[in-house]
Amino acid sequence: FIVLSQEGSLCSISIEKALPEDRGLYKCVAKNSAGQAECSCQVTVDDAPTGENAKAPEMKARRPKSSLPPVLGTESDATVKKKPAPKTPPKAAMPPQIIQFPEDQKVRAGESVELFGKVAGTQPITCTWMKFRKQIQES
């Protein structure tokens, strides 16, 4: 089962029983009216007894790409357009900022995986989890 959750500034994804096909790069994209930020982490799922995978998995902590405008190819055209600002703006909207990064995870098949990201910025912020450039859906 995959459970996606967003409570306030905390975005999370839980995989109840990880399978080898759950391994890969997971990306959290946080968006609001002012822009977007993203961060990613690597999930490794071992299905074989240790010894077969003698070399350590590649673990790279990726820093966020805060973007104004977003750097997402085709989507960027739509998100770059800004609404005309009112004559006296109340407060400038702050684009999302990742303040806590999801950590790389290494688990055995059948174990659970939880990834957390914490964001700051002007609400509402929507968080989307991606894997292989596809949005992850709950199951």
UniProtKB/Swiss-Prot annotation:
Annotated segments matching region Disordered: 48-97
Keywords noted in UniProt: Actin-binding, ATP-binding, Calmodulin-binding, Kinase, Nucleotide-binding, Serine/threonine-protein kinase, Transferase
Pfam families: I-set
Name of the top EC class for this enzyme: transferase
Function: Phosphorylates a specific serine in the N-terminus of a myosin light chain. Also regulates actin-myosin interaction through a non-kinase activity.
PANTHER family: IMMUNOGLOBULIN, MYOSIN LIGHT CHAIN KINASE, SMOOTH MUSCLE
UniProt record similarity statement: Belongs to the protein kinase superfamily. CAMK Ser/Thr protein kinase family.
Protein name, as recorded: Myosin light chain kinase, smooth muscle
Gene designation: MYLK
